[in-house]
Design a protein with these regions (language model features):
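Conserved class I S-adenosyl-L-methionine
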Residues: 94-104, 309-312
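Short, glycine-/aromatic-enriched active-site segment of Class I SAM-dependent methyltransferases
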Residues: 193-216, 220-222
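Flexible, glycine-/basic-rich loop-and-beta segments that form/coincide
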Residues: 243-289
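Conserved SAM-binding loop of SAM-dependent methyltransferases across substrates and taxa
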Residues: 105-116
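A conserved beta-strand element that flanks and buttresses the S-adenosyl-L-methionine
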Residues: 160-163
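A short glycine-rich, Lys/Arg-flanked "PGG" loop and its adjoining helix->strand segment in the class I
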Residues: 175-190, 384
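Conserved beta-strand signature within the Rossmann-like core of class I S-adenosyl-L-methionine
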Residues: 188-196, 392-398
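N-terminal juxtadomain amphipathic helix
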Residues: 1-74, 238
Length: 399
């Protein structure tokens, strides 16, 4: 495989086997047409970048019915409100210009609708962009790229902040992304983005962060090296609790900003923990294999003991777990979810029925596999009755 930034040849260090599209929830009639790919991961030692070998076409992924709305999570709504307040305090002033990449249903940008900030969101999924527009959030239904910004002259070289959250790892052509940012940012403008953190994935063995839409897993070291190639520099970082451990990166034009000491401290820490080294990748591979065996054996014992098991939350991440561990309806009876686009369909590859959360409440199992472990606090507070009636939670990561 080739590094998607440097074009160097890199050797995959691990295969997760045959995988379907992570968000490819489907009807029974479509089982026979389901497609799979061999999901392998590699590591560029030149720029310390963890990356996927193959990925789905973003135009297909973000088609009309992309099944995720940010506003469905109270936790994320709170997080984005705090994110908006922080950006306003640190980087915006009266009449500043702001663009969000992958703005979803407008949950983040809604915080700017009553300000004098000149903002705009880019959202490629039509149904989600339409929802943002219904929420009176200014949104362009398009991918954020060089071709789609040509008519936005008032933002060219005048944008104070370009931001994104859990989006950049989904974009295969980072070069085009950075060139687009370069055209829009003012001389002292900043690009701020949040993504799940490689170090957190390694420490938790949360391999379900890897699927066809998550093309990259970033570290502070890799972000620094990538942007240096394009005359930008990493000027600040902030660790976040979201998604099991994420990092907020702040990037600016070279020599236009003071670089915060936290960047240097994180790079020293990553070097100490060998996040910039293939050795950590091979250790992660070993830990994944151990985790897989533990999941299979634990669930098998539960079934042998007569336990009823369901899945909670039909996440994209669950597709990796279910297919990597070869789980299906022999083990998991159903998966409950609140997303209407998924209910009545089946999980990709494993073909477990997706049912509404009300079905979970009416048919409380003995064990619930929490696939949305990164939202555990919000879910635990909603599902106290499950525990009170003797149920227990299970996951491949520590809860």
């Amino acid at each position: 495989m080739k590094c998607k930034i440097t074009n160097e040849q890199i050797k995959p260090f691990m295969s997760f086997g045959k995988m379907p599209a992570a968000n490819g929830f489907l009807k029974e009639k479509d089982f026979k047409n389901e497609t799979f790919y061999n999901m392998e991961v590699g590591f560029s030692e030149k720029i310390s970048l963890f990356q996927l070998n193959k990925f789905s076409n973003p135009k297909i992924i973000h088609s009309t019915n992309y099944p995720f709305y940010t506003a469905s999570s109270e936790h994320m709504k709170t997080h984005f409100k705090k994110y908006a307040i922080w950006i306003q305090k640190e980087y915006l002033k009266s009449n500043s210009k702001l663009i969000e990449v992958g703005s979803n249903d407008g949950t983040f940008l809604k915080n700017f609708t009553t300000t004098n900030i000149d903002y705009l969101g880019f959202e490629p999924s039509k149904t989600i962009a339409d929802q943002a527009s219904k929420n009176n959030v200014k949104t362009v239904n398009a991918f954020f790229n060089d071709a789609n910004i040509q008519n936005l002259k008032k933002f060219h070289n005048k944008t104070d902040v370009i931001c994104a959250a859990n989006v950049i790892a989904h974009i295969p052509d980072l070069k085009n992304l950075i060139h687009t940012i370069e055209k829009l940012l003012s001389q002292k403008g900043v690009f701020i983005f949040e993504e799940p953190y490689l170090g957190s994935m390694f420490s938790k063995t949360s391999y379900d962060q890897i699927y066809d839409e998550h093309i990259f897993m970033f570290s502070v070291t890799s972000v620094k090296k990538i942007f240096q190639l394009f005359d930008f520099e990493l000027i600040d970082v902030h660790w976040q609790k979201t998604h099991g451990g994420s990092m907020r990166y702040v990037v600016g034009r070279r020599n236009k900003h003071k670089v915060n000491d936290t960047v240097h401290k994180w790079i020293i820490n990553e070097n100490k923990n060998k996040l910039d080294d293939m050795e950590s990748c091979l250790e992660f591979k070993k830990n994944c294999e151990t985790s897989k065996a533990k999941v299979i054996n634990s669930l098998k014992k539960m079934k042998n003991d007569g336990k009823n098991i369901c899945g909670y939350a039909a996440t994209a991440k669950s597709t990796t777990v279910l297919n990597y561990c070869n789980l299906n309806t022999d083990t998991i009876d159903f998966i409950c979810d609140s997303t209407k686009e998924k209910i009545g369909k089946f999980s990709p590859g494993s073909h477990i029925p997706i049912v509404p959360v009300s079905h979970f409440h009416k048919n409380l199992p003995d064990v619930a596999y929490l696939f949305a472990w990164n939202h555990k606090d919000e879910i635990f507070s909603k599902e106290k009755e499950f525990l009170n009636k003797g149920g227990s939670w299970f996951s491949h990561v520590s809860l």
